[in-house]
């Protein structure tokens, strides 16, 4: 499982049926790979909930998202598992099939909520417009395999 965390001043995701937005917090781009499990979702959710990615008065990254009353916008993104080794068109066979991936994606979002976080989401498996106003920028990539951070 791969999650790209971007610290944002604001972010939104829209399509024909959806309009979710947050102010200060994280925009998460969530990739579910063939071998991704609920254990991977748990360890990444814990890391994100406790990550100190917001500055204190001395410009040190000392505050986590709860300490700054931030929110999360979680967007599924199977393209994080693109295979670009051959040719010019990426392959996506490393992504988990959608029926299984959606379950892990929803489990991951619920795991974040279990830490008391406000989590808004995109719509799994649809084309969306994602607007991200990066803050910093601060971008961290979390990856887990077999329930362990890589």
Curated annotation (Swiss-Prot):
Intracellular or extracellular location(s): Cytoplasm
Recorded catalytic activity of this chain's protein: glycyl-tRNA(Ala) + H2O = tRNA(Ala) + glycine + H(+); a D-aminoacyl-tRNA + H2O = a tRNA + a D-alpha-amino acid + H(+)
EC number of the protein: 3.1.1.96
Gene3D superfamilies (alphabetical): D-tyrosyl-tRNA(Tyr) deacylase
One example GO MF annotation: D-tyrosyl-tRNA(Tyr) deacylase activity
GO cellular component, one term: cytoplasm
Pfam families associated with the record: Tyr_Deacylase
Motif Gly-cisPro motif, important for rejection of L-amino acids, residue range(s) on this chain: 136-137
Leading EC class: hydrolase
Entry keyword set: Cytoplasm, Hydrolase, RNA-binding, tRNA-binding
Keyword Heme: no
GO biological process: D-amino acid catabolic process
Record InterPro entries: Daa-tRNA_deacyls_DTD, DTD-like_sf
SUPFAM superfamilies assigned to the protein according to its UniProt record, in alphabetical order: DTD-like
Domain-level remarks: A Gly-cisPro motif from one monomer fits into the active site of the other monomer to allow specific chiral rejection of L-amino acids.
HAMAP family (alphabetical): Deacylase_Dtd
Function summary: An aminoacyl-tRNA editing enzyme that deacylates mischarged D-aminoacyl-tRNAs. Also deacylates mischarged glycyl-tRNA(Ala), protecting cells against glycine mischarging by AlaRS. Acts via tRNA-based rather than protein-based catalysis; rejects L-amino acids rather than detecting D-amino acids in the active site. By recycling D-aminoacyl-tRNA to D-amino acids and free tRNA molecules, this enzyme counteracts the toxicity associated with the formation of D-aminoacyl-tRNA entities in vivo and helps enforce protein L-homochirality.
Family: Belongs to the DTD family.
Assembly with partners or alone: Homodimer.
NCBIfam families on file: D-aminoacyl-tRNA deacylase (TIGR00256)
Name of the protein in question: D-aminoacyl-tRNA deacylase
Organism lineage: Bacteria, Bacillati, Bacillota, Bacilli, Bacillales
Gene from which the chain derives: dtd
């Amino acid at each position: 499982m791969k999650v790209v965390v971007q610290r944002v001043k604001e972010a939104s995701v829209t399509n024909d049926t959806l309009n979710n937005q947050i102010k200060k917090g994280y925009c998460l781009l969530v990739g579910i790979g063939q071998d991704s499990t609920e254990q991977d979702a748990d360890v990444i959710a814990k890391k994100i909930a406790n990550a100190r990615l917001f500055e204190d008065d001395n410009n040190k990254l000392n505050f986590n998202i709860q300490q700054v009353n931030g929110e999360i916008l979680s967007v599924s993104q199977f393209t994080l598992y693109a295979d670009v080794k051959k040719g010019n068109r990426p392959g996506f066979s490393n992504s988990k099939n959608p029926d299984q991936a959606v379950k892990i994606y929803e489990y991951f979002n619920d795991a974040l909520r279990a830490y008391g976080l406000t989590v808004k989401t995109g719509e799994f498996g649809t084309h969306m417009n994602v607007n991200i106003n990066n803050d910093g920028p601060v971008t961290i990539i979390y990856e887990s395999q077999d329930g362990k951070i890589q």
